[in-house]
A protein has these predicted regions:
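Mid-chain, structured segments of secreted extracytoplasmic proteins
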Residues: 64-109, 114
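Bacterial N-terminal signal peptides that target proteins for export
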Residues: 1-9
Length: 267
């Protein structure tokens, strides 16, 4: 099953194929790009993650990290609401030795809210809250190390899954045959749990999630045709390693979503 998924992702990344038959025929698949977290001191948070979770500095900046092809970026936010219970509830990272990782982050100031437990048929997992208010799931999935998933909350998970699949494509499948999800190029899972109440991501410690736009104009046209609500105009930003173009759209239940076009030579 894992090899089949890897093959499917490789084809999607190379050719930007349309979504599977279960998705809309016109839907294309977008590569997952980043998460942006709001913290009091972005460079301090980035260094904490680099030392304790992993990743490497990227874009010539020390306020962001690269995990595979996914960026974890930190912006200034002094009064951000902790992510727990929000529409973007937590992020997942996978390690070869979960027990050692949990002890490392505990010693570095994280709060371990759920100790390591082995879920039969799935993997070992634990939950922490980092020193900046972000809820994280740490897991031991040898088949998928590094940045692993984004976990949302929704009053209607199936409707929310349908929106993301229709909007951004991906492979709709089950994680280890246990959890419904969408797997995106970049090897990132989108998981959704049922919740009667959430709060929007903007203003929370996990401020927004993001997908890659291979071409901004084509992406805007594609999303407009799907009836997606835009919440900003596209604009450029110059980074030490190139220029990006980005804009924001509204996701279900207050999820803030960014689309980013990166220069061709940017990782």
């Amino acid at each position: 099953m894992y090899n089949k998924i890897k093959t499917g992702l490789a084809l999607l990344m190379l050719f930007c194929l349309p979504g599977l038959a279960s998705a809309q025929a016109e839907s294309k698949t977008y590569m997952y790009d980043h998460v942006h977290m709001a913290v009091p001191e972005p460079e301090v948070a980035a260094q904490w993650y680099k030392d304790n979770i992993g990743g490497e500095f990227i874009d010539g900046r020390t306020d962001r990290l690269l995990f595979g092809t996914t960026r974890i970026m930190f912006l200034n936010g002094d009064a951000a609401t902790p992510s727990t219970g929000g529409v973007v509830d937590h992020l997942g990272f996978s390690f070869t030795d979960l027990a050692a990782t949990v002890e490392r982050v505990r010693a570095a100031g994280a709060t371990v809210s759920s100790e390591v437990r082995d879920v039969p048929g799935l993997f070992k997992l634990a939950f922490i809250v980092d020193p900046f208010g972000n809820r994280m799931e740490l897991i031991e999935d040898a088949q998928h190390l590094g940045f692993h998933h984004v976990h949302l909350r929704s009053a209607d998970p199936q409707a929310t899954f349908a929106w993301y699949e229709a909007t951004f494509g991906g492979i709709r499948t089950n994680l280890r045959g246990r959890m419904d999800g969408i797997l995106y190029p970049g090897n990132v899972w989108l998981l959704i749990s049922q919740a009667d109440a959430t709060f929007p991501s903007q203003g929370a410690s996990i401020d927004h999630i993001g997908w890659r736009a291979l071409d901004s104009a084509e992406t805007i046209a594609d999303l407009q045709a799907k009836g997606v609500e835009f919440t900003s105009e596209p604009r450029d930003m110059t980074l030490p390693n190139g220029i990006i173009n980005f804009f924001y759209v509204q996701g279900p239940e207050g999820a803030r979503i960014e689309l980013v076009h990166r220069a061709a030579d940017m990782r």
